[in-house]
Regions:
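N-terminal anchoring/stem segment of glycosyltransferases
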Residues: 1-70, 91, 273-274
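Short His-Asn-centered micro-motif
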Residues: 10-15, 40-43, 76, 98-101, ...
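Short acidic, S/G/P-rich loop/turn micro-motifs used as interaction or catalytic elements
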Residues: 15-18, 104, 152
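A short glycine/serine-rich beta->alpha loop
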Residues: 68-75, 130-134
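Conserved glycosyltransferase catalytic-site signature
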Residues: 76-83, 178-183
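GT-A fold catalytic core of metal-dependent nucleotide-sugar glycosyltransferases
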Residues: 78-127
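Short beta-strand-to-loop element that shapes/binds the nucleotide-sugar donor at the catalytic cleft/hinge
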Residues: 121-148
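Catalytic core and acceptor-binding pocket of nucleotide-sugar-dependent glycosyltransferases
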Residues: 144, 150-264
């Protein structure tokens, strides 16, 4: 059984997305308390977000001004920077999830780490992801990328060293749709890892207990309510976790300080009660 303390969930947030950081941590602390959580920000924490974080305990770090070459970032840039960040400390982990900050992650059986490591081991590669279907636009991966850090960064550090200054200089030329996910695939193709296995996507989904979201994509819920979530495979499986999560005193405290997101999550829970 993999050791949960050897798991790291890493994400990034620019100023408009800081509002999701406390919620990202709240749900991960419930789901996988021993796992490390790392949030990299482009600017300083807003005062209201800092106050929310004082309510949280657990194994997490929120790092301000984490990208010294930037004073601030736009959405495309911050999403690309998650693929273009390496620290030696990452190599202490057996598994690392690099994904979106606007996620409420729930505990699953088997756990998140086990699901993705099984996919890696099945294909003999150091990453678990899929190629989006052709109807989704330019060929690219998804924005939730799970890796075996030691092997992944051994192959990817030359790509990081190449593309991070190119990103800053505006020299990466890719179509706008899914820009950061195209960059991720481009880095894989150009690295020693090469072309992903032909059966990458078809083996990905059976490896998962529910979906690649492993919970609720809060931004989808903001945009479309429960209908916005119904496109995620296995979304019904999360009913017990979301119902329990919205009933805690800590959830009520966070909601009082972040009523928009708290209200959305409470509304989603009410919708789940009807399933």
């Amino acid at each position: 059984m993999p050791d949960e303390s050897k798991m790291c969930f890493m994400t990034v947030a620019n100023r408009p997305y800081q509002k999701y950081v406390p919620w990202f941590l709240y749900f991960l602390n419930r789901a996988y308390p021993k796992a490390h959580k790392l949030v990299l920000l482009d600017v300083a924490l807003a005062d209201n977000i800092r106050q929310m974080l004082t309510l949280l305990s657990g194994n997490f770090e929120v790092r301000e001004r984490a990208f010294p070459e930037y004073t601030h970032t736009d959405a495309n840039t911050i999403k690309c920077l998650r693929w273009l960040t390496f620290e030696p400390a990452f190599e202490q982990y057996d598994c690392m999830s690099i994904g979106d900050v606007d996620m409420a992650t729930y505990v699953e059986t088997p756990p998140y780490m086990d699901q993705h490591l099984a996919h890696c081991d099945q294909l003999g590669i150091p990453y678990s992801n899929f190629i989006r279907p052709p109807q989704a636009g330019p060929r690219r991966m998804s924005g939730i990328h799970v890796i075996k850090p030691r092997e992944w960064f051994a192959a990817m550090r030359p790509m990081i060293n190449k593309y991070r200054p190119m990103l800053k200089a505006g020299q990466i030329r890719l179509p706008e749709q899914g820009f950061n996910e195209q960059l991720l695939l481009h880095m894989v193709l150009e690295s020693s890892l090469g072309e992903p296995p032909a059966n990458l996507s078809e083996t990905y989904w059976p490896s998962l207990a529910t979906s690649n979201h492993h919970g609720t994509h809060i931004r989808l819920a903001e945009c479309g309510g429960i209908r916005g979530l119904q496109g995620a495979k296995g979304y019904r499986n999360h009913k017990p976790e979301i119902l329990a999560a919205v009933k805690t005193p800590l959830f009520r405290q966070l909601s009082a300080m972040s009523p928009q997101i708290g209200g959305i999550l409470a509304a989603i829970a009410r919708a789940y009660e009807n399933f």
